[in-house]
Amino acid sequence: MTEFIADNIVEIDTQLGGWEHITAGYLVTGESPVLIETGSQSSAPLLIAELQSLGISPSDLAAVVLTHIHLDHAGGVGDIARVFPKAKVYVHPSGARHLADPSRLINSASMVYGPLLDSLYGRLDPTPADRIIAVEEGDTIEITKGLHLEALMTPGHAKHHLSLWHEPTGTMFCGDAVGVKLPEVGILWPATPPPDFDLALATQSLEAMKSRSPSHLAFAHYGRFANAVDILDEGKDLLRDWCRVAEAAMVDGREIETALEEAFVPDLKDLDPTARDRLLTLSGVHANAMGISRWLTKRSEHNGQNSRPAD
């Protein structure tokens, strides 16, 4: 399913697990069309068919940009690169080597996801190294002469996370940096997985995006939303709230996951059960608790003390 959501921007529902409105890719059209996010490998056949339905032939796609290399965002990149042989693949420098040789990434994912890896996500096929371009802060990717996407380094969710600024439409493609905002759910929900989550970096990244005064945020999970600055502020408050609850639990010797469930899962009580299950499949309390717990532990070790108020 595709939808033009702004001038020259097409939202493509990549349907992770066959679910609608859970994972999105975005095609920015022009003389050199650019695909942002591929979704998982399990979504690749659908994505390829949708691109072809939009008139994108194998020789047309100029670039693929990945906000980060988690499998729900990048798992299909090897398949897309194979079908669209002229497309360059843009990624954070720390992610480039994993696209060329994904063996370590797949091994790690196997330990995290277990049987869900193959049933829900699929794997990640290698991308030819000569087609991978490492993106730095401020680099641009041309769409049409005089029009481009600009890369912002936005670590926090993952250390190798980047976002993309499309000034003509005021759209910031934010990946998972701001969290998850599914249409059927409505509320913003954090995404703080291990091993890289870092509160200070995450909030700095949201400020960096806010400095561009975007009118819209385009989430990988899911869709393009107005009132971008308000959502960015909400995202900062949300991350700080979750981290404060987790820190208090750690100081009190309580299970962080239990404390977070008690504090925030009641916010989901009025949701349709299917919508709630989709949200928690994408960004469950268990994974978020693991990420925050790891961050708190690393911060304590760095500071040489048990705790300090969350930023």
Task: Enumerate the language-model features and the residues they cover.
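Conserved beta-strand hairpin/beta-sheet module of binuclear metal-dependent hydrolase folds
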Residues: T2-L54, P58-D60, L164-C174
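Core dinuclear metal-dependent hydrolase active-site scaffold
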Residues: L27-V28, G138-E167
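Residue-level marker for buried hydrophobic side chains located in beta-strands
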Residues: V34, V65, V89, T171-F173, ...
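Active-site metal-binding loops of divalent metal-dependent hydrolases
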Residues: T38-S40, I69, S94-G95, H157-A158, ...
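Metallo-beta-lactamase
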Residues: D60-D72, L99-L152, L206
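Divalent-metal (often Zn2+) His-rich catalytic cores of metallo-beta-lactamase-fold enzymes
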Residues: T203-R254
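C-terminal regulatory/interaction regions
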Residues: V245-D311
